Regions:
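Membrane-interface capping segments at transmembrane-helix boundaries
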Residues: 2-3, 75-76, 129-136, 247-261
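Alpha-helical transmembrane segments of multi-pass integral membrane proteins
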Residues: 13-21, 90-101, 118-127, 145-163
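Central hydrophobic cores of alpha-helical transmembrane segments
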Residues: 206-218
């Protein structure tokens, strides 16, 4: 069907845009690196909820997974796949928004990056919901479809928190600085509730692992860098452990033949 070929082509184009935008937005062609954009608001020192620098290495794994997905979905057997018909367009949108965030951070304003990443998070949540309506038939599908998009969703969850907090840090009155740790712990409590609920409902491990990865490096950042906050670090570690436990518990509740990443 022409529509199926169009879907596959749009996904390829979206992945290409994402990779080009990632290169441009990260400063690979001579521009400013992400950590230096927006007056340093997006750096590891930008707020109490910013992960330490090594956390962002997860993007390499996410991009690799999305590239593998793009190649896999373009193969003839996937052309008329009903699962891909349902979710392919949404994954394409998520890749476009992924690239658009980097372009926005590089050339536009911090509030607009919050808008773009919120749209990206909502789109990825939609992807996870659609994937939950039917199960992957093979392990390659579990890895490149469920796994890659699950990692993307989990990481963007914590990235949205960091991005939004960076913006609030810039616009908040100076008097609020004394309550920064309290607000940080409160936000982490919200992440805990939403993350556990998501893990138990979706019964997936990849989102929990990616979010926990970010939280772990958030803790490292607060213990070894600025702004220093032992309280925030401890809270982040607790949330990370509970999220992984909830993810494992969710997966174990699935039938063996219905394991999802």
């Amino acid at each position: 069907r022409t529509q199926d070929i169009a879907r596959q082509s749009i996904i390829i184009a979206s992945a290409t845009f994402m990779l080009i935008a990632a290169a441009v937005g990260s400063g690979a062609f001579g521009g400013t690196s992400v950590s230096e954009l927006q007056d340093g608001a997006l750096s590891a020192q930008g707020s109490y909820l910013a992960p330490a620098g090594p956390a962002f290495s997860i993007w390499s794994l996410i991009y690799l997974g999305l590239i593998a997905y793009t190649v896999w979905q373009a193969l003839p057997p996937q052309r008329a796949d009903e699962r891909q018909r349902a979710v392919g367009g949404w994954i394409a949108v998520s890749m476009i928004l992924n690239g658009l965030w980097l372009v926005t951070a590089q050339f536009l304003s911090l509030p607009l990056t919050v808008l773009v990443i919120a749209l990206l998070l909502a789109t990825l949540a939609r992807v996870i919901v659609i994937l939950g309506r039917s199960r992957a038939r093979t392990w390659p599908e579990r890895i490149v479809v469920d796994g890659a998009n699950g990692l993307h969703f989990g990481w963007v969850t914590i990235a949205t928190v960091a991005n939004t907090t960076a913006w609030f840090t810039q616009i908040a009155p100076a008097a609020w600085a004394d309550q920064a740790e309290i607000w940080a712990v409160a936000v982490l409590a919200v992440v805990l509730v939403i993350g556990v609920a998501s893990a138990l409902v979706t019964r997936r491990i990849a989102p929990a692992l990616a979010t926990a990865w970010g939280l772990g490096w958030l803790a490292v950042g607060r213990l070894t860098g600025e702004p220093e906050s032992t309280v925030t670090a401890i809270a982040a570690i607790i949330v990370a452990i509970v999220l992984v436990a909830a993810g494992v518990w969710g997966v174990l509740r699935r039938p063996r033949a219905d394991i999802a990443l």
